[in-house]
């Protein structure tokens, strides 16, 4: 399977940079020259500064309108660069990594997603977005809600990562994001690395594309890992990966259309009876009743690793909370704005104009009404 990871904005390029570390094909797009220079693993010729004529290379200060305009202005440059990387080989999936709460990522990613769908109709466009932390305040929440709406119209799937679920207590925002980015890449890279790999029962690119072609709905990744020597019930470990504690989004899995499960570990632990017991349970839970699976026995492994992907999700508390908060704020803000305008009008209504208070030059027949020249002389 061929995938191209495209990082957009500060958050997105940091995530893409970690994908580059584990040998994925990547490209970075940002409005901040400094953020692009900070990257460690994406080659310099694949780092593109966009919107320089608007921002001077200093970023958009979390303003999605500027992020959108920056992407629009330099979209021909971006698409040419992507075309030079893609060449004549098909790309199965474009993964766009970004932060829902930022400016360049939130504003620019929907623009790029739409352009990629038009240019490469046989490829999937999947957005991988980090939802903002509660501590970041209202502005990132509003950015996220609007971006969710826009991406749902152009992307095949939106893999939303709820940072609030992954953040460990006591972490500040900076260190929390660093850990979260590593977690996102580790889990998704683990899944992609197993596609088209020989196994007892394998997943291929068409399986993954089928699961992710989900009409702009949400998808989430689940994960569970344990020391093989301590696994007493493999079925329970698999189920843990798609229950709330294992998922990266607070979602109702019963609303999912499709599922995909990849299991990797020593052969003596990967018992077929345990695996099918767990998969039968998952099949009974999700609405679409379609589960793709891959089993990868490896005698060199000491751990059992389970990666789950659920797609076609329309019920998520994480998403619903963001959208509801943004709507409530919008109503409150518009009401406050209307009240402020009304009070301003009430306060200032009835004031005279200057012409009502001071006689005009024409009315006095003088070039110096009211003796202003004399006043200026005295003031000296």
UniProtKB/Swiss-Prot annotation:
Database matches in InterPro entries: CetZ (IPR032907), CetZ_C (IPR048737), FtsZ/CetZ (IPR045061), Tubulin/FtsZ_GTPase_sf (IPR036525), Tubulin_CS (IPR017975), Tubulin_FtsZ_GTPase (IPR003008)
Coiled-coil ranges from the UniProt annotation: none
Binding, GTP: 10-14, 103-105, 136, 163, 181
Region named Disordered: 359-380
GO MF annotation: an example: GTP binding
GO CC, alphabetical: cell division site; cytoplasm; microtubule
Highest taxon of source: Archaea
Presence of the UniProt keyword ATP-binding in the record: no
Keywords attached to this entry: Cell shape, Cytoplasm, GTP-binding, Nucleotide-binding
UniProt keyword Nucleotide-binding, yes or no: yes
Main location per the UniProt record: cytoplasm
GO biological process: cell division; microtubule-based process; regulation of cell shape
Entry's localization field: Cytoplasm
Function: Involved in cell shape control.
Similarity field: Belongs to the CetZ family.
The protein's name in its UniProt record: Tubulin-like protein CetZ
Protein's gene: cetZ
């Amino acid at each position: 399977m061929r995938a191209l990871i495209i990082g957009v904005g500060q958050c997105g390029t940091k995530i893409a940079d970690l994908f580059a570390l584990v040998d994925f094909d990547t490209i970075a797009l940002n409005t901040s020259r400094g953020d692009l220079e900070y990257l460690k693993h994406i080659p310099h010729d694949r780092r593109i500064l966009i919107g320089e004529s608007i921002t001077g290379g200093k970023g958009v200060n979390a303003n999605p309108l500027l992020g959108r305009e920056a992407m629009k202005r330099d979209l021909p440059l971006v698409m040419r660069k992507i075309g030079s990387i893609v060449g004549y080989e098909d790309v199965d999936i474009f993964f766009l990594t970004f932060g829902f709460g930022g400016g360049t990522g939130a504003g620019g990613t929907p623009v790029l997603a739409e352009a990629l769908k038009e240019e490469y109709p046989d490829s999937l466009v999947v957005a991988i977005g980090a939802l903002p932390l509660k501590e970041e305040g209202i502005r990132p929440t509003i950015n996220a809600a609007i971006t969710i709406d826009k991406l749902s119209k152009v992307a095949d799937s939106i893999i939303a990562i709820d940072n609030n679920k992954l953040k460990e207590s006591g972490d500040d925002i900076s260190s929390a994001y660093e850990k979260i980015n590593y977690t996102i890449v580790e889990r998704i890279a683990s899944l992609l690395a197993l596609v088209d790999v020989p196994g007892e029962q394998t997943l291929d690119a068409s399986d993954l594309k089928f699961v992710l072609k989900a009409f702009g709905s949400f998808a989430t990744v689940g994960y569970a890992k344990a020391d093989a020597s301590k696994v007493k019930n493999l079925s329970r470990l698999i189920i843990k990966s798609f229950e709330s504690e294992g998922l990266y989004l607070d979602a109702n899995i019963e609303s999912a259309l499709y599922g995909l499960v990849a299991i990797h570990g020593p052969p003596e632990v990967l018992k077929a009876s345990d695996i099918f017991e767990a998969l039968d349970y998952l099949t009974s839970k999700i609405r679409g009743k379609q589960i793709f699976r891959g089993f990868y026995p490896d005698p060199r492994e000491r751990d059992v690793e389970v990666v789950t992907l659920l797609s076609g999700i329309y019920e998520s508390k994480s998403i619903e909370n963001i959208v509801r908060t943004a709507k409530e704020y919008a109503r409150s803000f518009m009401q406050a704005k209307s009240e402020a305008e009304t009070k301003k009008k009430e306060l200032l209504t009835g004031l005279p104009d200057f012409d009502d208070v001071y006689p005009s030059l024409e009315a006095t027949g003088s070039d110096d009404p009211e003796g202003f020249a004399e006043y200026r002389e005295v003031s000296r």
